[in-house]
């Protein structure tokens, strides 16, 4: 029986390895299908949608069909959202590049922009999970991604640490990048953000100081 259990765990592990490799290749293909710049956002949204279904226990979901449906469905919305995020990122980068801290006030300004940049990066961790979980207007994804990244800072820092660790792993083993890069990172982020969303959905389980977050997400609870 112990042998059967070990074999079952090994088969399950191999199954997940194949899942990550397959979805990573799908992400690469659909990114190229959109000529790169127009494909990366809908391909990433489709990848997160598949990861979300797996995390919800839908193990038998048709991956290719789901990926293609999400890719088509999110093509314009995700690209518009991506354009907004890219603009914000470029503005932050230019500000940091142009501001040389020659005196005290510029030091303060540069530090403030760096904090804003950190918040922007933290917000990015939540954008795609929210995009595939809720059907909102574009501005709400930015708003609530920022809100969650601050309100659940411990989860945000966990995602940051995991992302840095995965980047070091991929840099050490570049041969696995085509198979286990974006898919692995997206699964980790989706699982953590999904746990955050479950906390938000809890009725009466949130601390009072965070109750306004649940009401913002689910106005019927007001």
From Swiss-Prot:
Any one GO CC term of the record: plasma membrane
Pfam families on file: DUF624
Transmembrane segments: 25-45, 80-100, 111-131, 160-180
Keywords (A to Z) from UniProt: Cell membrane, Membrane, Transmembrane, Transmembrane helix
Keyword Transferase assigned: no
Topology of this chain in the membrane: Multi-pass membrane protein
GTP-binding is among the record's keywords: no
Places the protein is found: Cell membrane
Protein name as it appears in the record: Uncharacterized protein YteU
Lineage: Bacteria, Bacillati, Bacillota, Bacilli, Bacillales
């Amino acid at each position: 029986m112990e042998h059967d259990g070990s074999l079952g765990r090994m088969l399950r592990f191999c199954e997940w390895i194949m899942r990550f490799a397959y979805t990573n290749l799908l992400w690469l293909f659909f990114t190229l299908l959109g000529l790169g710049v127009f494909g990366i956002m809908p391909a990433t949204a489709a990848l997160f949608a598949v990861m979300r279904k797996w995390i919800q226990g839908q193990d038998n979901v048709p991956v290719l069909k789901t990926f293609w449906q999400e890719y088509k469905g999110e093509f314009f919305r995700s690209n518009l959202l991506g354009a907004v995020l890219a603009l914000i990122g470029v503005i932050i980068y230019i500000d940091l590049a142009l501001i040389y801290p020659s005196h005290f006030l510029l030091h303060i300004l540069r530090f403030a922009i760096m904090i804003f940049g950190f918040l922007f990066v933290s917000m990015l961790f939540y954008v795609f999970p929210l995009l595939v979980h809720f059907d909102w207007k574009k501005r709400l994804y930015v708003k609530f991604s920022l809100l969650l990244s601050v309100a659940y800072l411990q989860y945000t820092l966990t995602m940051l640490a995991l992302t840095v660790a995965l980047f070091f792993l991929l840099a050490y083993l570049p041969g696995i990048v085509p198979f286990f890069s974006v898919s692995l990172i997206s699964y980790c982020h989706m699982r953590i953000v999904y746990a955050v969303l479950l906390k938000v959905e809890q009725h009466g389980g949130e601390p009072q100081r965070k109750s306004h977050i649940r009401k913002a997400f689910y106005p019927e609870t007001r």
